């Protein structure tokens, strides 16, 4: 694909960036269970790179890892369990990264656990979500090397409630990071990058017009 327009404006001779991707995976599906695994490798060439002489297409990098997903509805009646995990090793030499290193946005471990329990008589689904990510890399000038340190891991516990008020109305409420953890999303000049708010609340009412029902009641 073409480099970002702001880089082309500075250096029109930049080449199109290239990516080669290889994937292999498999899945298993049985009564109430679904498992999936995928391994991947990506190789990047002709990335935009800052040099003393200006912008060039001499950047390169790679990304490899595995994505795992497990879904199980057979552990307990009315309970749905979803577990996902990804492992990623990513390195780039591009833009201001003058040596092959892990970019600021790349986290090595990411995982989430979602539990949904249906209260059939109350026509309500209660959801609990736990999210985790290993620390984001950042440059610590006290240490040698580039992007040589990590922030503390990301963690968030979220809650959600979905209520089928009528056959045509669904009410949904959710709250993120209910434990009010101070998560960092990187550091610049030693100062942590924080979210504008530690947690968020959401309340939505969904009404279906022109149909017999908003949702299949049997799912509640």
Please provide the spans of the model-predicted regions.
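Outer-envelope beta-barrel architecture signal
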Residues: 31-35, 77-81, 109-111, 122-126, ...
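Outer-membrane beta-barrel strand-turn architecture
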Residues: 18, 28-32, 43, 62, ...
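Residues that define the transmembrane beta-barrel architecture of outer-membrane proteins
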Residues: 18-22, 29, 60-66, 105-111, ...
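Outer-membrane beta-barrel translocator domains and adjoining extracellular loop/strand segments
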Residues: 3-10, 39, 47-54, 88, ...
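Gram-negative outer-membrane beta-barrel transporters
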Residues: 40-43, 56-139, 179
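C-terminal beta-signal and adjacent terminal beta-strands/loops
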Residues: 75, 132-139, 161-220
């Amino acid at each position: 694909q073409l480099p970002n327009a702001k880089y082309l404006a500075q250096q029109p001779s930049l080449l199109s960036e290239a990516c080669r991707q290889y994937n292999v995976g498999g899945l298993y599906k049985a009564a109430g269970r679904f498992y999936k695994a995928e391994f991947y490798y990506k190789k990047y060439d002709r990335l935009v790179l800052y040099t003393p002489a200006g912008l060039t297409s001499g950047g390169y990098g790679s990304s490899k890892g595995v994505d795992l997903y497990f879904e199980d509805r057979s552990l307990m009646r009315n309970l749905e369990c979803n577990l996902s995990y990804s492992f990623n090793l990513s390195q780039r030499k591009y833009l201001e990264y003058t040596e092959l290193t892990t970019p600021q946005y790349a986290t090595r471990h990411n995982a989430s656990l979602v539990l949904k329990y249906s209260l059939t008589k109350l026509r309500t689904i209660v959801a609990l979500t736990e999210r985790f990510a290993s620390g984001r890399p950042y440059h610590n000038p006290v240490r040698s090397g580039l992007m040589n340190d990590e922030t503390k891991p990301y963690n968030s516990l979220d809650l959600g409630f979905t209520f089928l008020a009528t056959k045509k109305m669904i009410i949904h409420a959710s709250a993120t990071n209910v434990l009010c953890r101070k998560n960092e999303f990187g550091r610049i000049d030693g100062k942590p990058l924080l979210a504008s708010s530690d947690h968020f609340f959401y309340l939505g009412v969904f009404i279906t017009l022109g149909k017999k029902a908003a949702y299949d009641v049997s799912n509640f």
